[in-house]
Amino acid sequence: MEKQSLTFDGDEEAKIDRKSSKYHPSIWGDYFIQNSSLTHAKESTQRMIKRVEELKVQVKSMFKDTSDLLQLMNLINSIQMLGLDYHFENEIDEALRLIYEVDDKSYGLYETSLRFQLLRQHGYHVSADIFNKFKDDNGSFISSLNGDAKGLLSLYNVSYLGTHGETILDEAKSFTKPQLVSLMSELEQSLAAQVSLFLELPLCRRNKILLARKYILIYQEDAMRNNVILELAKLNFNLLQSLYQEELKKISIWWNDLAFAKSLSFTRDRVVEGYYWVLTIYFEPQHSRARVICSKVFAFLSIMDDIYDNYGILEECTLLTEAIKRWNPQAIDGLPEYLKDYYLKLLKTFEEFEDELELNEKYRMLYLQDEVKALAISYLQEAKWGIERHVPSLDEHLHNSLISSGSSTVICASFVGMGEVATKEVFDWLSSFPKVVEACCVIGRLLNDIRSHELEQGRDHTASTVESYMKEHDTNVDVACEKLREIVEKAWKDLNNESLNPTKVPRLMIERIVNLSKSNEEIYKYNDTYTNSDTTMKDNISLVLVESCDYFNK
């Protein structure tokens, strides 16, 4: 017997107590579809590509011609911060092997910190004990370091690369920050700009494409800049930006065709912001297919979140969960009309992904389906908690909400469109919820809750981890947020540890997970800038996706 769809007449609908909040509309609209001035002319693009190849040859020669290891370290550091390192992976790997073997006992603070940073960033096991030489007999950092702004900044940045038990890096963090703040007014422009940038968010927690865009502006004012590298950075960024604009135009047209902004008007219309979030996971051109697939998945997940969290009643959410678990078009029986539309388009989009994948890649969609099913189940649990006014313990909350953070689903989606490196073994590893994925989920969940707490409680939202901690420890919101931030820092140490060689899966895959954690730090730095996107999110999107670099000023 066919199930009857869950429908309500006008009077019944009016009586339903929905939690719906008003989100501001898309601030971008059709900008990336209609603005023809965004992309460069074909002839201009070809000239830029030709010039980039010429400049790359010159930079590769720099690696060969540089015998001084400090100059080599500075070269690698500049290339990485300018977003050029994917062009020079072999040269950097070879240089790091030399740098690893060097005896750094005679190095000063800057050189020691830079060496440690570069090696840790690439998974080398280097001991933090090397920084003990900068301490006095009382265990304090020596006072002669206080005026060394460049060295202090480098030490400050590496202090965030620590793993559990490396207390000297925790001490370095506490020591360097006030010193750098006090020196700010005395520094030359380029160094002051770097200090300001990294005090806001340290180097190892910045997403690479936004860092590249911001660092270009700093580097061009540096008296010690290399003009070949600067020109390459600007041209390379503009070429990447053109690619991103093409991707976003296609995604925006796809989004408009789905028409969710009209049929599901209670949801956040954030397809541009979602694309930017995915872009921070992998900005390199070879990941174009993966970015587009992941961005489309992200758009569907954002809607799903709003259905469970902001609009659907418990009966509707239960029906949607059962339909998602079945993953079959026939499962729409019983769904209200607005959910039928969403559900069928979800299934159709996943079929399109499968068609796009190679024959030996199609199995990946089964893993992604399982992730979406787990996400729906976790959303339903939170919906039930909200109805019951249940405030779970922190452990009970995290057992469910690490999944509802969506981070593990986004990670899986980010792997689907990648190349041969994304093997079945990688997906099996991912589905086991390894430590590095758990840490990423902790960071995403807790940062979201810390920044969204006041807004969400003001609209009768399910208890967050902030409420769970407050109830369990009988404390106030400020203490709860401080303690949750400490848990975030522990999760970062887990991430740092899991990033050291040898990694359990190819390093490229670990980096996707770390990059998602970095983007969570940026997006939830001051508030939920995805939901409230007319903030720093808008500024950052403009920098990366709209404003090109003036590469004629070398």
Swiss-Prot record:
Reaction equation(s) it catalyzes: (2E,6E)-farnesyl diphosphate + H2O = beta-eudesmol + diphosphate; (2E,6E)-farnesyl diphosphate + H2O = 10-epi-gamma-eudesmol + diphosphate; (2E,6E)-farnesyl diphosphate + H2O = alpha-eudesmol + diphosphate
Cofactor: Mg(2+); Mn(2+)
Keyword line: Cytoplasm, Lyase, Magnesium, Manganese, Metal-binding, Plant defense
Induction of the gene: Peak of expression in summer.
Tissue specificity statement from the Swiss-Prot or TrEMBL entry: Expressed in rhizomes. Detected in stems, but not in leaves.
Short sequence motif named DDXXD motif, residue ranges: 305-309
Compartments reported by the entry: Cytoplasm
EC code(s) of this entry: 4.2.3.68, 4.2.3.84, 4.2.3.85
Residues that hold Mg(2+) 2 according to the record: D305, D309
Pathway connected to this protein: Secondary metabolite biosynthesis; terpenoid biosynthesis
GO BP annotations listed: defense response; diterpenoid biosynthetic process
Binding sites annotated in the UniProt record for Mg(2+) 1: D305, D309
Record-linked Pfam families: Terpene_synth (PF01397), Terpene_synth_C (PF03936)
Top EC group: lyase
Taxonomy, superkingdom: Eukaryota
Positions with a binding annotation for Mg(2+) 3: E456
Comment on bound cofactor: Binds 3 Mg(2+) or Mn(2+) ions per subunit.
GO cellular component annotations of the record: cytoplasm
Domain remark from Swiss-Prot or TrEMBL: The Asp-Asp-Xaa-Xaa-Asp/Glu (DDXXD/E) motif is important for the catalytic activity, presumably through binding to Mg(2+).
Sequence similarity: Belongs to the terpene synthase family.
Stated role: Involved in the biosynthesis of beta-eudesmol, a sesquiterpene with antifungal activity and responsible for resistance of plants to ant attack. Produces mainly beta-eudesmol, but also smaller amounts of 10-epi-gamma-eudesmol, alpha-eudesmol and aristolene.
PANTHER family linked: ALPHA-HUMULENE_(-)-(E)-BETA-CARYOPHYLLENE SYNTHASE, OS04G0344100 PROTEIN-RELATED
Protein's name in the database: Beta-eudesmol synthase
Lineage of source species: Eukaryota, Viridiplantae, Streptophyta, Embryophyta, Tracheophyta
Gene, per the UniProt record: ZSS2
